[in-house]
């Protein structure tokens, strides 16, 4: 029995891979999906192309996933887990004057994934496919805000409260809007707008909690 990747437990799989070799096949499908997204975007993606790139039979794809959207959802959840783990590790290192400065860490890790993780620059957390790709009951940015709030309280030194919940939602929405503009102006993210995003978050969060 192979260990199931945590993100797959929440993905719309027809069934979870029960053996190590099945898990490896599913991982290859997700890797193939990431590569193809970078090459042609979601509109050019298909289960047939994913199967060909992953080196598996099309029947193997449908054994686990009903369609290409389900595969991108699993990939988006994988990205969310990776992002969460990276931010948690950085926050655990400490060294910040105040937890509101964690905004820099969050933005830096997001940018590094955009530049280095296959498929992330094309999918990010799923809005290009569906604004509720990560969770059919919740908007993607809300899912991200919940994760970040948990990180800030567990590792960053913030205290759980209703005001924090609202502030993190606003911060995520604001950062998302400015970063999308930064990527429209420069494929790697306009450096000036990235710095403005960090300043915006530090100032906003500092106003409420500094």
Predicted regions and their residues:
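Hydrophobic alpha-helical bundle segments that form small-molecule/ligand-binding pockets
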Residues: 96, 116-123, 131-134, 142-168, ...
């Amino acid at each position: 029995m192979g260990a199931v990747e945590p993100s797959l437990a929440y993905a719309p799989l027809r069934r979870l891979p029960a053996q190590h070799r099945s898990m490896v096949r599913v991982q290859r499908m997700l890797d193939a999906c990431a590569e193809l997204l970078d090459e042609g975007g979601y509109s050019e993606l298909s289960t047939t192309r994913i199967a060909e790139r992953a080196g598996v039979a099309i029947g193997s794809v449908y054994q686990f996933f009903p369609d290409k959207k389900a595969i991108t959802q699993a990939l988006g959840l994988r990205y969310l887990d990776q992002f969460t783990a990276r931010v948690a590790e950085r926050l655990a290192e400490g060294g910040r004057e105040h937890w509101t400065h964690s905004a820099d860490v969050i933005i830096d890790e997001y940018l590094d994934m955009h530049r280095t993780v296959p498929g992330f620059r094309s999918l990010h957390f799923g809005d290009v496919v569906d604004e509720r790709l990560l969770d059919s009951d919740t908007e993607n940015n809300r899912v991200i805000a919940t994760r970040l709030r948990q990180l800030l309280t567990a590792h960053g030194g913030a205290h759980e409260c209703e005001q924090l919940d609202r502030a993190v939602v606003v911060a995520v929405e604001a950062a998302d809007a400015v970063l999308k503009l930064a990527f429209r102006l420069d494929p790697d993210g306009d450096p000036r707008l990235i710095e403005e995003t960090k300043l915006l978050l530090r100032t906003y969060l500092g106003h409420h909690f500094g």
